[in-house]
């Protein structure tokens, strides 16, 4: 009797397991990470263009014509909120520039509270050793680049937006010491892995204060034969 009960229970478990497999086959499939969130390979890191100079992403190269409405660590803020000097939505649609040469890791809608987001990975070389940092551009209106694109310092990559109407237009700008791209919280008490954006760019500008204007940074247009 006990043996019959055992075999019946075993048959029931096997039957229910098979039924679950047939009704929900997706549970048996391997999961795959979004390619945008995979760690770049050593080859991809080695092929990154070197960033020899950094400039500010909004206004002029050294940050004029824009102001910092909420600074790094203020209210646990993980970046700088950059606005046009007119305030409110006066900078809506203004150009956002890549702060340095690099490669776009992510360019897409970041979800609620973010609007469009772009993340660019930069390689810095000093004494033969490479260091990698990310520049992060949040609340963009229009995205002008795709993931995988190489960009140059001063290249327009987006326009200033409102996170789909959630805020007055501004650029949420971060600098990070990460390789893998992720959207992030925007606010966090611990800032490990995040850099003070204004301080970082000021230290890596490699140009005098009077060096303004972005002409000459973009590839020259190809003339028709």
Predicted ranges, named:
Residues 160-172:
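Active-site loop architecture of trypsin-fold serine endopeptidases
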Residues 112-122, 169-172:
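Short aromatic-glycine-enriched beta-strand elements
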């Amino acid at each position: 009797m006990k043996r019959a009960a055992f075999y019946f229970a075993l048959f029931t478990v096997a039957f229910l397991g098979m039924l679950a497999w047939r009704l929900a086959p997706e549970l048996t499939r391997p999961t795959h990470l979004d390619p945008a969130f995979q760690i770049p390979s050593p080859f991809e890191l080695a092929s990154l263009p070197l960033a020899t100079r950094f400039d500010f992403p909004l206004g002029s190269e050294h940050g004029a014509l824009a102001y910092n409405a909420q600074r790094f660590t203020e209210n646990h803020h993980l970046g700088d909120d950059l606005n046009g000097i007119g305030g409110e939505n006066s900078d809506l649609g203004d150009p956002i520039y890549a702060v340095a040469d690099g490669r776009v890791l992510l360019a897409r809608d970041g979800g609620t509270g973010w609007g469009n987001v772009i993340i660019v990975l930069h390689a810095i070389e000093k004494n033969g050793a490479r260091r990698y940092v990310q520049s992060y551009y949040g609340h963009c209106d229009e995205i002008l680049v795709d993931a995988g694109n190489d960009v140059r310092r001063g290249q327009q990559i987006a326009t200033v937006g409102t996170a789909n109407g959630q805020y007055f237009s501004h650029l949420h700008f971060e600098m990070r010491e990460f390789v893998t791209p992720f959207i992030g919280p925007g606010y966090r008490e611990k800032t490990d892995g995040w850099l003070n954006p204004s301080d970082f760019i000021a230290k890596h500008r490699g140009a005098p204060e009077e060096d303004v204007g972005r002409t000459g940074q973009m590839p020259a247009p190809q003339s028709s034969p």
